[in-house]
């Protein structure tokens, strides 16, 4: 089930997302968050976390850094610095226009 859900999100990323203007207020994007949540927490909890993230992503929130936490929660990651890996830091640095390498 986890693989099917991941495949659906990747299909969205590849075929639908490029047709829409960028709108995600968070890093990583909501679709990437969903895939990471599925991988880390399984189909049910990962789906719930991804849906909660999509509902949080709206014009009334500041957005910002919100990686998938190591524990299950439907709220924003309270300690994003603890759940970053090197690729997240490099991607964020590149997105912000800094040097990376």
Curated annotation (Swiss-Prot):
Q: Which HAMAP family match?
A: UPF0161_YidD
Q: State the superkingdom.
A: Bacteria
What is the annotated localization of this protein? Cell membrane
Q: How does it sit in the membrane?
A: Peripheral membrane protein
What functional role does this protein have?
Answer: Could be involved in insertion of integral membrane proteins into the membrane.
Q: Per its record, how is this protein called by name?
A: Putative membrane protein insertion efficiency factor
The record ties this protein, via Pfam families, to: YidD
